[in-house]
Amino acid sequence: RDLRMSRGLGDVYKRQDGTTHQMGELYTILATQNPVEQEGTYKLPEAQLDRFLMKITMGYPSLEEEVDILERHHANASLVKLESLTPVLTKEELLSLRRLMEHVFVDRTLLQYIALIVQQTRTSKAVYLGASPRASVAMMQASKAYALLQGRDFVTPEDIKFVAPYVLQHRLILTAEAEMEGYSPVKVTQRLIDKVEVPK
């Protein structure tokens, strides 16, 4: 199967047997990323990375979690059967939440706050390539979704500060000097956020 991302993740087409199909409105792409140093692993182009809403780093499992993984593999039960999974949301409920998110209020001062954070990535000496306007849109959407999950119909500066590292870290390319000094995209993002005055 050949997946092609066109204009955004909302416009993903699947090409199979020479036929192109537009995917449904709830079609979502989740991708894993291996270290670039691993054989056969290559960096995605910036334009493709920019189409992913967020990057979430899972980290290593705890001792208990790793023992659980070993037990499941030992019992040959490592694969979860789809029929044993219980849905937590129906398609209709998910679409309803999406419609609710559209009505989450974002004050103009917070739109400026988002834009200022993203613009900082373009002027920072630690950043070789900053975030595009698509990152601003992603940060606004992620902030609205997070506010909704917190039971609110409005976005706060704290929502923006919470989602910003996840939205920006895969979109920033650091300078060689910054990398040699031990900076990571998350660390740089946090410093840039701290530079921007929080709206009152």
Predicted feature locations:
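Single conserved hydrophobic/aromatic residue that forms the stacking wall/gate
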Residues: R1-Y13
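Short, conserved glycine- and acidic-residue-centered signature motifs
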Residues: M5, P45, S132
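Canonical AAA+ ATPase core
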Residues: D11-V104, K144-L149
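Solvent-exposed alpha-helical segments within well-ordered globular domains of core cellular machineries
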Residues: L30, A47-D50, M54, E64-R72, ...
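Non-catalytic accessory segments flanking P-loop/AAA+ NTPase cores
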Residues: Y60-R72, S84, E102-V106, A176-K200
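Conserved AAA+ ATPase small/helical "lid" subdomain
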Residues: S84-S136
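C-terminal engagement/docking regions of AAA+ P-loop ATPases
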Residues: T121-K200
